[in-house]
Curated annotation (Swiss-Prot):
PROSITE patterns: CRISP_1, CRISP_2
Name of the molecule in the record: Venom allergen 5
Single GO cellular component term: extracellular region
Domain SCP residue range list: 68-212
Keywords: Allergen, Disulfide bond, Secreted, Signal
Length: 227
């Protein structure tokens, strides 16, 4: 669907401006990868999308619950040895896979990054208590509709089809399976996500960012302990 002429939009905000940006001095955080912290560089939840037309940003309470449930359902599927996909499959069961809990600070930093409408990983997103990992997903349609955030999470899960469980995590895993491995990294305890929907030319896009703490995807380490 082409967009022409004047467009009048009411931007729907579904996230409360959390106090973390004011309570924490992110400019003092030194990330292991270097760079200026995302919450320091951009400083607020105000979208900064250039000529893209922002439709809405943030996640509802229900969407947060759905995202968390999808993560934990998938982690428990792996833990029970019920995932048959892989290269080769199946994935072995895990004995140290715990459920994730939602973390509002991780969600705040993820939302700040999502609101830049820049697809890809930011450089510095760590918080005071740990290093932070990240998954990103972007979908688009020429129809005026936006994918449910759980559908974007499932895109990360689907990377399991390319994962070889017989070896430890390596740099070769990042491109094809890095989102999957972060989702099921056993030592990761918390997750928080941000979302923005916008129009770019004829495309209606939904961008989801999830931050994870402590971070996963460490070289030559196992995703989890097998039974």
């Amino acid at each position: 669907m082409e967009i022409s002429g004047l467009v009048y939009l009411i931007i729907i905000v579904t996230i409360i401006d959390l106090p973390y940006g004011k309570a924490n001095n992110y400019c003092k955080i030194k990330c292991l990868k270097g760079g200026v912290h995302t919450a320091c560089k951009y400083g607020s939840l105000k979208p900064n999308c250039g000529n893209k037309v922002v439709v809405s940003y943030g996640l509802t309470k229900q969407e947060k619950q759905d995202i968390l449930k999808e993560h934990n359902d998938f982690r428990q599927k792996i833990a029970r040895g019920l995932e048959t996909r892989g290269n080769p499959g199946p994935q072995p069961p895990a004995k140290n896979m715990k459920n994730l809990v939602w973390n509002d600070e991780l969600a705040y930093v993820a939302q700040v990054w999502a609101n830049q409408c820049q697809y890809g990983h930011d450089t510095c997103r760590d918080v005071a208590k740990y290093q932070v990992g990240q998954n990103v997903a972007l979908t688009g349609s020429t129809a005026a509709k936006y994918d449910d955030p759980v559908k974007l999470v499932k895109m990360w899960e689907d990377e399991v089809k390319d994962y070889n469980p017989k070896k430890k995590f390596s740099g070769n895993d990042f491109l094809k399976t890095g989102h999957y491995t972060q989702m099921v990294w056993a030592n990761t305890k918390e997750v928080g996500c941000g979302s923005i929907k916008y129009i770019q030319e004829k495309w209606h896009k939904h961008y989801l960012v999830c931050n994870y703490g402590p971070s996963g995807n460490f070289m030559n380490e196992e995703l989890y302990q097998t039974k």
